[in-house]
Amino acid sequence: MTLKARIIPCLDVKDGRVVKGVNFVDLIDAGDPVEAAKAYDAAGADELCFLDITASSDNRDTIFDVVSRTADHCFMPVTVGGGVRSVADIRKLLLCGADKVSINSAAVKDPDFVAQAADKFGNQCIVVSIDAKRVSKDGEADRWEIFTHGGRQPTGIDAVEFAIKMVERGAGELLVTSMDRDGTKSGYDIGLTRSIADQVRVPVIASGGVGTLDDLVAGVRDGHATAVLAASIFHFGTYSIGEAKSYMAEHGIAMRLD
């Protein structure tokens, strides 16, 4: 049986509201993440990713409320990331209805945290989110470095080596974002995605840079990703989930089309 590729819209949530805007027709409140989630669920998204970018830990309770209300209304799996620093954070998100929890900076700071989380909750619900920038110069072998704290802090850590280490620690999935491409609409960094996907035995989600439906196809066909994440092309109604799935299927990618 061929593993079907997944399309995952991503919503950035700050203080309980969607930021970067969502332009859905017929949505009463496009800033409400639960309304946006319901629209994506109805449109046939395979999964949804919430990224909590709330700056202060005082407002963390809002994301728990968002996840809980989304779980009440939606059937698609939901991954939640942003500010996950402890086993208690993961437990609370899972209890609220998240299917998977994404760990970013905390995994860089303490790789054993990933092992503890996977041991306690199972590999299948632990995603490690990798934000990487290309640091190799022209003519050099490709090399990417991990950045943390929303891409502001270089770590000196090689992204591909780190990805392998995270899977060894128990990550069940990797979310790989190219910081060079993020928001540019110039397509995924295929070299980055493929370099990681070819080295690990877990699903890899390509992220950062989608501008066209061809970019989604390339993420799977050329980048060897098992899932493709996008934000603005769906949020602003450039393409629908249905159009994206049909296009990918027409280009030879196995998709769930029901």
From Swiss-Prot:
State whether keyword Cytoplasm applies: yes
**Which protein family is it in?**
Belongs to the HisA/HisF family.
Q: Which residues form the signal peptide?
A: none
Which EC number(s) are documented for this chain?
4.3.2.10
- Pfam assignment, any one: His_biosynth
Report the pathway entry: Amino-acid biosynthesis; L-histidine biosynthesis; L-histidine from 5-phospho-alpha-D-ribose 1-diphosphate: step 5/9
The catalytic activity, as recorded, is:
5-[(5-phospho-1-deoxy-D-ribulos-1-ylimino)methylamino]-1-(5-phospho-beta-D-ribosyl)imidazole-4-carboxamide + L-glutamine = D-erythro-1-(imidazol-4-yl)glycerol 3-phosphate + 5-amino-1-(5-phospho-beta-D-ribosyl)imidazole-4-carboxamide + L-glutamate + H(+)
| CDD domains from the UniProt entry | HisF
- Going by the entry's taxonomy, the superkingdom of the source organism is recorded as Bacteria
**Entries under HAMAP family matching the protein:** HisF
Listed disulfide bonds for this chain? none
Protein name per the record: Imidazole glycerol phosphate synthase subunit HisF
Kindly list the organism's lineage: Bacteria, Pseudomonadati, Pseudomonadota, Alphaproteobacteria, Hyphomicrobiales
Provide the assembly information: Heterodimer of HisH and HisF.
Read off the NCBIfam families from this record. Answer: hisF
**UniProt keyword NADP present:** no
Instruction: Tell me, in one coarse class, where this protein mainly resides.
Output: cytoplasm
The record's keywords, sorted A to Z, are: Amino-acid biosynthesis, Cytoplasm, Histidine biosynthesis, Lyase
A single GO BP: L-histidine biosynthetic process
A GO cellular component annotation here is: cytoplasm
Kindly list the places in or outside the cell where this protein is found, as annotated in its UniProt entry: Cytoplasm
Show the GO MF annotations.
imidazoleglycerol-phosphate synthase activity; lyase activity
Active-site residues are 12, 131
Record function comment: IGPS catalyzes the conversion of PRFAR and glutamine to IGP, AICAR and glutamate. The HisF subunit catalyzes the cyclization activity that produces IGP and AICAR from PRFAR using the ammonia provided by the HisH subunit.
